[in-house]
């Protein structure tokens, strides 16, 4: 599975670079949310979805109290017409009082790594 994902990501990146003249640089639109209503103490899935970005090189990290959460799964890099890309990263979690969850995004269009915070639906 890892080799397949790596191959697909490399292929998409190569295709994007071949067609650089067809795309313009674009910042990622970032959405961080939970699969179910965010309730403290209830198992859930934390999701970070980034879309509309170019070039394709991007790094996503799901964080709990500013520390990367182990075991997160990442989708294959995909693109829309105009060579704008989208990617999703998710992980199982059980939110507790006092914990802070965020998605850290690194992309060439951002001056620095940027954190986007998840807020429970209370």
Swiss-Prot record:
SMART domains recorded: IGc1
Keywords: Disulfide bond, Immunity, Immunoglobulin domain, MHC I, Secreted, Signal
Protein name: Beta-2-microglobulin
PROSITE patterns recorded: IG_LIKE, IG_MHC
Name of the gene this protein is made from: b2m
Biological classification of the source: Eukaryota, Metazoa, Chordata, Craniata, Vertebrata
Gene Ontology BP terms: antigen processing and presentation of peptide antigen via MHC class I
Function: Component of the class I major histocompatibility complex (MHC). Involved in the presentation of peptide antigens to the immune system.
Signal peptide, first to last residue: 1-23
Subcellular location, record wording: Secreted
Family per record: Belongs to the beta-2-microglobulin family.
Source organism superkingdom: Eukaryota
Disulfide bridge partners, by residue number: 48-103
GO CC annotations, alphabetized: extracellular region; MHC class I protein complex
Quaternary structure and partners: Heterodimer of an alpha chain and a beta chain. Beta-2-microglobulin is the beta-chain of major histocompatibility complex class I molecules.
Pfam families attached to this UniProt entry: C1-set
Chief localization: secreted
Residues of the Ig-like C1-type domain: 28-117
């Amino acid at each position: 599975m890892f080799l397949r994902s790596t191959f697909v990501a490399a292929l998409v990146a190569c295709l994007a670079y071949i067609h650089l003249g067809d795309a313009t640089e674009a910042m990622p639109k970032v959405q961080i949310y939970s699969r179910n209503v965010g309730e403290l103490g209830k198992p859930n899935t934390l999701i970070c979805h980034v879309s509309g970005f170019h070039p394709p090189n991007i790094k996503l990290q799901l964080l709990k109290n500013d520390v990367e959460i182990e075991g997160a799964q990442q989708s294959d890099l995909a693109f829309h017409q105009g060579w704008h890309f989208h990617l999703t990263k998710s992980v199982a979690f059980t939110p507790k009082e006092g914990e802070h969850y965020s998605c850290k995004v690194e992309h060439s269009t951002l001056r620095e790594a940027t954190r986007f915070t998840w807020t429970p639906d209370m």
